[in-house]
């Protein structure tokens, strides 16, 4: 039976609390690493080696592709082979060196995923430069901070981003002297650059700088830093996470070993759609894996509305996503089902129940119902291009109802992973066809050790019958520290263990369930501790809520919340309950607010929340929390200090009116 399976084994015993240090649970490792962690392929010690050996093995394979635009219309994907890309990388590297850039200097890359992004990155890898992605989603303030903090001397920039980059001047020009466009440069931009003290080149212009010149490539050591990835963080300035060659080589080795053990190996036939930001370690790590096996990377056009069309043209076999993207896929499919008539919906429901039932009995998604796949679910598969064999979700937890739905209807392996920039992405991953792993992030990948550390102030006990505690990671994927912030490094890196700040719970089969966030805890006026992330997960079960931010502080005795209602669900309720007006006015309606508050309270009681954990007032916000207002990080985590600043007046008013109504006994 599946419940008897266990996918981890113990490598070190648990330790009781001593000298003020909390207790820690046993150290566990993936059963795929019974004979030790997998070793990298001979000759691969750096990111450059990953690319160089792929060029040697697969010179004529398609490597990088984009859609050709003719008369404003997108055509087929046009490809560059591994050898063609290599030749451009060498030229670009020669140009870098010819304008005085030396090993160890910092090179910024700013823009949407494209061929030039990867080529610039590989040129950095070739010459031992630190590749510093400049976040496309963070705005000029953060870009300016990163350029100055990392001391970026040259930046490769998407054409459209040149004006944004200029906004960082004059502060950034203390370090940044050269800018290279991924495309062309307008004459007025040349003039502006000159005034700012910058030299700016078009892509073709820059490639010519190194013509006829050759430079010896430096030796790259495993411990050398290859990239500094700045994490937006939910508080304060971005932190520069230093990632070594060894970290990336270790993660690619671990991913290959893991996929090989679950019969989902990557190969040179694989095609990957590149649309998640290369500035994030999730996409960077996956693309390194694709390059290592000689696979193909096709780039989207940069517009989420055109993503499905790009998928249809590219027909990828590997599709990585963040939960928000898969949520949209799920919602879109549900809407189509609702609008397709009673008969179609009934056929779908019967097929879904039948196939899901067989999968629960232990059948693989392929064997569970080939008939239903062909007749009912094939349209879903075609919607993703028709060839997808792996969907991998990462960056945030994927709701289990969406994961189970996709495992049935997408006709492919649906996996969920967990990792941090500091752990170079993958740390846990679910298995194909193991439904016991639904709602978890799976067991550890076979290149890390994991243990839980008790969090007494939150009543999480790593030695309890159901072990819960802060997830701690050990292994060669871990980062080399925060750039210029040894103080912050020491806070999270203790005795070789990375303290993630995430609270997890071991499942009987060795999977990990993320249940809370250690730092998102505060005390109410009466002295009760509130683990706010856990509460938000509970309140998010309310169907009419899309997103919710729960707030409290040590001066108040109760909680309030700002909620983004689900528009269609609330509008449907409004029609049924005689509430008129558009979505904005419905959100301001007292009857709608009372309805949603009632649903939140009902859910709180169903989940046996304590009295002080029940929300006393809610404000309905029609505009979803977004990055444009700096309320979310690029991985869609809530920026709590910024939310408080933005909604300060609303929060103040909610506390005032709720206290008045409580005082009057209403």
Swiss-Prot record:
The EC number(s) this enzyme carries: 6.2.1.3
PROSITE patterns documented for this protein: AMP_BINDING
Pathway involvement of the protein, from the record: Lipid metabolism; fatty acid metabolism
Signal peptide location: none
Gene3D superfamilies according to UniProt: N-terminal domain of ligase-like (3.40.50.12780)
Pfam families: AMP-binding (PF00501)
Transmembrane segments: none
Binding residues for ATP: 228-239
Cofactor dependence: Mg(2+)
Function: Activation of long-chain fatty acids for both synthesis of cellular lipids, and degradation via beta-oxidation. Preferentially uses palmitate, palmitoleate, oleate and linoleate.
Listed name of the protein: Long chain acyl-CoA synthetase 5
């Amino acid at each position: 039976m599946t419940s008897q399976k266990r996918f981890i084994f113990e490598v070190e015993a648990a330790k009781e609390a001593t000298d003020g240090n909390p207790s820690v649970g046993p150290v566990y490792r993936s059963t795929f690493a019974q004979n030790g962690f997998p070793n990298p392929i001979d000759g691969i010690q750096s990111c450059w080696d990953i690319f160089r050996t792929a060029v040697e093995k697969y010179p004529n394979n398609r490597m990088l592709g984009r859609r050709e635009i003719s008369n404003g219309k997108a055509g087929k994907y046009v490809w560059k082979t591994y050898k063609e890309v290599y030749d451009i990388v060498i030229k670009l590297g020669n140009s870098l060196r010819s304008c005085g850039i030396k090993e160890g200097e910092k090179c910024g890359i700013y823009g949407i995923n494209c061929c030039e992004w990867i080529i610039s990155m590989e040129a950095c890898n070739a010459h031992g430069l630190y590749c510093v992605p400049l976040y496309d989603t963070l705005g000029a303030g953060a870009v300016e901070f990163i350029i100055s903090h990392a001391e970026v001397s040259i930046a490769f920039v998407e054409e459209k981003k040149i004006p944004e980059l200029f906004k960082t001047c004059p502060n950034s020009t203390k370090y940044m002297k050269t800018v290279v466009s991924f495309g062309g440069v307008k004459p007025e931009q040349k003039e502006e650059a000159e005034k700012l003290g910058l030299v700016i080149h078009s892509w073709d212009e820059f490639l010519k700088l190194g013509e006829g010149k050759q430079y010896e490539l430096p030796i790259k050591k495993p411990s050398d830093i290859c990239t500094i990835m700045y994490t937006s963080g939910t508080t304060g300035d971005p932190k520069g996470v230093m990632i070594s060659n060894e970290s990336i080589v270790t993660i690619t080795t671990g991913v290959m070993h893991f996929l090989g053990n679950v019969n989902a190996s990557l190969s040179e036939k694989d095609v990957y759609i590149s649309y998640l930001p290369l500035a994030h370690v999730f996409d960077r790590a996956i693309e390194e894996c694709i390059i290592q096996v000689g696979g193909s990377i096709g780039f989207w056009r940069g517009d989420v509305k055109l993503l499905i069309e790009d998928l249809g043209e590219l027909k990828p076999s590997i599709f990585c996503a963040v939960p928000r993207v898969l949520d949209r896929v799920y919602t879109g499919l549900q809407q189509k089902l609702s609008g397709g008539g009673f008969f179609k919906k009934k056929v779908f429901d019967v097929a879904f129940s039948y196939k899901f039932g067989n999968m629960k009995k232990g059948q693989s998604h392929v064997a569970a119902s080939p008939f239903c796949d062909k007749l009912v679910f094939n349209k879903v598969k075609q919607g993703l291009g028709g060839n997808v064999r792996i969907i991998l979700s990462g960056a945030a937890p994927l709701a289990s109802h969406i994961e189970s739905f996709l495992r049935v209807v997408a006709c492919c392996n649906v996996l969920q992973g967990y990792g941090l920039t500091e752990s170079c992405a993958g740390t846990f991953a679910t298995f194909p066809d193991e439904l016991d792993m639904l709602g978890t992030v799976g067991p550890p990948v076979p290149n890390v050790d994991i243990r839980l550390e008790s969090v007494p102030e939150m009543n999480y006990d790593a030695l309890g019958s159901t072990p819960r505690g802060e997830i701690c990671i050990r292994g060669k994927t871990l980062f080399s520290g925060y750039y210029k912030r040894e103080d912050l490094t020491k806070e999270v890196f203790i005795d070789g263990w990375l303290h993630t700040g995430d609270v997890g719970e071991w499942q009987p089969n060795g999977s990990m369930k993320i249940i809370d966030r250690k730092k998102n805890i505060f005390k109410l006026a009466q002295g009760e501790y509130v683990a706010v992330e856990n509460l938000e997960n509970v309140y998010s079960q309310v169907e009419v809520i899309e997103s919710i931010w729960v707030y409290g502080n040590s001066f108040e005795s109760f909680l309030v919340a700002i909620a983004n209602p689900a528009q269609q669900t609330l509008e449907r309720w409004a029609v049924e309950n005689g509430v008129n007006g558009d979505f904005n006015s419905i959100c301001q309606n007292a009857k709608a607010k009372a309805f949603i508050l009632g649903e939140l309270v009902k859910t709180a009681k169903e989940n046996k929340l304590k009295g002080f954990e029940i929300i006393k007032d809610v404000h309905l916000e029609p505009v979803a929390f977004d990055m444009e207002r700096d309320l979310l990080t690029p991985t869609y985590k809530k920026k709590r200090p910024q939310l408080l600043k933005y909604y300060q007046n609303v929060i103040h008013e909610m506390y005032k009116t709720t206290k008045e109504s409580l005082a009057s006994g209403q």
